[in-house]
Regions:
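FIC/Doc superfamily catalytic core
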Residues: 1-167
Length: 167
């Protein structure tokens, strides 16, 4: 963590202290959204993500899909919701609302051919996997969510563990 703290201080010197609070928040929202969506296969660059933030659906670059644009716009919505709710404790309500916002315009499209459709803001009704990772019995995992949220909130409240370690 000491290396992390050194990097954070250097980042503050080079980037964040040179921006207004509003600009810094928007800068992070754009970077976070672009890179988070890229992990899921979205091909928007950071610059294209910034332009989409500024101009909305009126600007979809050549070769990009409406689905990709909606993924990023939904991500913006979820990011802004969480930013406005930083003081709220971690609850299933917060988790589900974040998921609803994050997938509002894309989940039904992505799962339209699935036998069991998924709904934004709701837990899965089937066991899930990603690549060669199988996550286990979805019903058992769902039962553990309240305990996970509560224990994570307790650790955050205690301030004894650095948030980056918790993440």
């Amino acid at each position: 963590i000491s290396r992390y703290d050194i990097l954070v201080n250097r980042y503050k010197e080079l980037v964040s202290e040179k921006l207004s609070r509003k600009d810094f928040i928007e800068y992070n929202e754009i970077l976070f959204s672009a890179h988070s969506c890229a992990i899921e296969g979205n091909s928007f660059s950071v610059d294209e993500t910034r332009t989409l933030k500024e101009k909305g659906l009126g600007m979809i670059p050549k070769g990009k899909t409406l689905l990709e644009a909606f993924e990023i716009l939904d991500h913006f919505q979820a990011y802004e919701y969480l930013l406005k709710n930083l003081d709220r404790p971690l609850t299933e309500e917060l988790l589900k609302e974040t998921h609803r916002l994050l997938t509002e315009h894309t989940l039904s499209y992505k799962t339209q051919y699935d036998e069991i459709p998924s709904n934004p803001g709701e837990y899965t009704t089937v066991d899930m996997c990603a690549g060669d990772t199988i996550f286990g019995d979805h019903e058992q995992l769902i039962k553990q969510v309240p305990r996970l949220l509560q224990s994570t909130q307790q650790v955050l409240d205690s301030g004894k563990i650095h948030p980056m370690i918790i993440a």
